[in-house]
Amino acid sequence: MGSGWVPWVVALLVNLTRLDSSMTQGTDSPEDFVIQAKADCYFTNGTEKVQFVVRFIFNLEEYVRFDSDVGMFVALTKLGQPDAEQWNSRLDLLERSRQAVDGVCRHNYRLGAPFTVGRKVQPEVTVYPERTPLLHQHNLLHCSVTGFYPGDIKIKWFLNGQEERAGVMSTGPIRNGDWTFQTVVMLEMTPELGHVYTCLVDHSSLLSPVSVEWRAQSEYSWRKMLSGIAAFLLGLIFLLVGIVIQLRAQKGYVRTQMSGNEVSRAVLLPQSC
């Protein structure tokens, strides 16, 4: 809250804690009670329209409210009528409350905007099929978009340059808990040879939309790619095994040399005697 606003709210609360006749309505004062003041700023289209509201609550019941749209204190219960009348009679208090729209709400908005409403994080986009893709067989293509902020985002699917609207499903934006979002947009497909699927992502953090392609390949191409991956992994395993064997062989050679020296000494000693 802005400077100059907190003191008068505190003063009002101190005044309320007296629980005078206007609050107790002639009854005995309760032993335990809670008085609260809650202030809220409501923004529409940035700071184009701002509403400042202060709620005064006695034992969980709101009884007096200041609304900048109304411009005065309003009693919500009989308990609040004397206080509303008293506060509305103080022109300095009314003026300070009305000025809070600029002095509190718009002021704090400018301070917090760079790391709240102005914060932007670019998304990471990945496209992958749900199952091993085979031509002419139904499958589901996933467009995974992660780590973006704010949550408003547009994601579209294209097949050979034409937008696909049918068979599109989305999880919607999901909060990650770290001020970022993630979402997955899925497309039902039956891939044909030569088909090019494109996931187009448009977000306020991007200078231009990001597109990621996925191309349908023949079963032979997939088998060839998988065979290449398997051959690479197998070669890597053989390489590691060879390195381990070589290291062990070098250690064995050193031990053999030491054993040979010991044997030589054992043979020479009797001859010297």
Curated annotation (Swiss-Prot):
Residues 123-213 form the Ig-like C1-type domain. Keywords: Adaptive immunity, Disulfide bond, Endosome, Glycoprotein, Immunity, Lysosome, Membrane, MHC II, Signal, Transmembrane, Transmembrane helix. Residues 27-120 are annotated as: Beta-1. It is a single-pass type I membrane protein. Residues 121-214 are annotated as: Beta-2. Important modulator in the HLA class II restricted antigen presentation pathway by interaction with the HLA-DM molecule in B-cells. Modifies peptide exchange activity of HLA-DM. Belongs to the MHC class II family. This is HLA class II histocompatibility antigen, DO beta chain. It comes from Homo sapiens.
